[in-house]
């Protein structure tokens, strides 16, 4: 058999075993079986994909993302074991991981949102309660994120725990891009900011690996991932992560790529412009748009005329929206404060050594913005011309309306208006010294008075203009009141320029003569200095060559130093890793010692608390008794004092009552007199009152029939509605009852078919047993001969539901091994007596039953050659009337391995009552039947069928077990082909007998069973010949 065939067979076996475990409800054991298989597989086979699919579904049901991560790593190792492999199976597994969980999350989220919309008040009143559906949703979202994280780790890095050889992960670039995009979209869709931050750190850790092994495709893949990460970060409002993302892109573009693609650079500058806009760096934002426009214009073949018009218009408005810089900017650039450092850091992303000047940048922008919208064609010229401040706002009014109405330009409206305001303020400050506030407000119609004052103060703070707001006189006074030298120098230079122009206009001929004379002198000097200039040029060329050589040497030295530093960093990293591992080991040992110390301390504390409780209880009892005695003494002493106080209080109360009663009678008489007087006064209006009330009552009587009729109509409608509701509820209940009845009938039909199939299978096994050849005892192997074989195959240990027992010599056909220190076997009343240890409790047999001595050190029983203990590869044993039928564990499938199940060491010793075996019940054993049967386990289950009391043993039958049957009126146990003949004596439990053996046919238990041959038992079975039927 080839290796691939062996792998396929082993995989199919594991898959079938896992499916069997799933059918009986043991999904955790099925998951463990598949995990063990994947961890042992280092070679690829196509059947592994099916196994991995089942493994993924089990992990999703259990929400076990740790097992999922390990399984993905093992599956990756199996795929990479091929010389030429395909990543399609890995992509299919990733799809099976993601798709069902995303659907489940969407369903739960929609359900929760729907419930919240239907019951908003319930949601507000139950804020403090934990919603189980919300908790389940968070569990699924946690599992989905951990799955994404595990898949990204598998595709980007090597896990030394599972992978022992280095591998080029660039083959997974396409899959990595797809999975990373889905993970980032998941964070954006469900607003998972913490998960998004974990993903960004995971991506940043891969940059170091890119520097070690740079690959063009891998770098481009990571750049695309960072672009998508930047978009998601901006949508989530995580601007610090967005800045780090653009920094990573800058490093990978200009450090790892020799010549980046123009398309990638255009996208980079577009994303960079978004970052600058968020940070309010409007000038750098416009500069990034300028770069983006240039790359698209020169390299993008799909760049249409409409795109060019839109991009150039956006660039022009963005450039003009950049704030006007200070006149004397050198002082601010020389200050190494945090703001300047921040500005330089942002400018470095554009490969700039300093912040560009606004005027220079506007000149460059005018060269490339010739295709703007017609409405903005003269916008730049309006800003450049010296226009009157009284007309500046009116000229820009249509431009402002166009910008406000355009979708792509409207975001620049606020900074554009700020620049327009600053421009107007600067022009007004040069024309006027004093201007009324109302007049100045008219010059800026798009701002309110409060906004104008605020922006004017900001301009003064930035030293763009010099002004003071005089609210007392309602004016604005312009001028630099600190006598700034810059203002004075501007006035002097303007005066010199004006005087020079006046002189040229007064004496033009004299000026021309002087100019010609100066020109001739210059020509003579140039001719005389030609040789000297030539020598200077040659010397300069030589200096340049030397400087070039020096620069090349410096570059080589710098690269060598960088290489040495990189090697040094690698060595330091290895040393740090080794030190970290050592510290981790020491830390684990220390933590283990601390845990042991804490546990000991905790035990001591608990003992001390228990002791203190006992002492405190005694003290409390003593103090309670003392308080009881003291209280009784107090009450005996205070009794005379209380009686005297009570008498005094009674006299005082009587006096108080008499005085208050006299006062009350006096006041009551006064009130009565006033009421009589008032009644006499009001008697004159009684007729009018009676007349009015009688009119109102007559009017109400006329309206009463109509109101009664309307009320009767509403009542009848209510009754009809109630009747309809009752009929609808009845119909729903009837429909549910019919569905339940149909489901019950379907399940009963399935159960009947299953029982019939098991019955036929049992008959087939019985026919095989009847036709098996006889094996003489001399050709069988003894227990002692198979000692080594049992130890190697792991067949020692307790049988399910049974107890350990000793071995004895063979007696009348059975070859049972016996320990050397055990007494010889004996038989009482036709039964079996097996060897036991001298220190074991004495066995007993009541009414033909067995009592097996239990030894702690005895080997486990097994059923070889007709003895006790069922072989794992044999069919499950049965219990037919009078014999033992060992039930299988309800919560476990049939065992295929040789390993014994765990046995409870604290189980009670076995006993036999009323002619049946009573074995110590295991926690995982089937329920026993009380009374009349051997092998009853534990207390009787409420759902078990009634037992049979008339003779013989009756074992509880599992729901899925085959129906028991009788052969020839007695017990007929199916035996293995290699089983020995049974013992001749009666009693004990009859295990598979040989056809040639002459057993005792007149045993008491067998005779009793024949009497009950044609009677129905409690389960509804009737014995007819050798079969059972309903």
UniProtKB/Swiss-Prot annotation:
GO cellular component, one term: eukaryotic translation initiation factor 3 complex, eIF3m
SMART domains: PINT (SM00088)
Region of interest (Disordered), residue spans: 576-603, 737-1030
Keyword vocabulary terms for this entry: Coiled coil, Cytoplasm, Initiation factor, Protein biosynthesis, RNA-binding
GO biological process: formation of cytoplasmic translation initiation complex; translation reinitiation
PROSITE patterns: PCI
Composition skew (Basic and acidic residues), residue ranges: 576-591, 743-771, 800-931, 939-985, 1003-1019
Pfam families in alphabetical order: eIF3a_PCI_TPR-like, PCI
MF-aspect GO terms: mRNA binding; translation initiation factor activity
Compartment list: Cytoplasm
Residues spanning the signal sequence: none
Subunit structure: Component of the eukaryotic translation initiation factor 3 (eIF-3) complex.
Function: RNA-binding component of the eukaryotic translation initiation factor 3 (eIF-3) complex, which is involved in protein synthesis of a specialized repertoire of mRNAs and, together with other initiation factors, stimulates binding of mRNA and methionyl-tRNAi to the 40S ribosome. The eIF-3 complex specifically targets and initiates translation of a subset of mRNAs involved in cell proliferation.
Name of the protein this chain belongs to: Eukaryotic translation initiation factor 3 subunit A
Species of origin: Dictyostelium discoideum (Social amoeba)
Taxonomy of the source species: Eukaryota, Amoebozoa, Evosea, Eumycetozoa, Dictyostelia
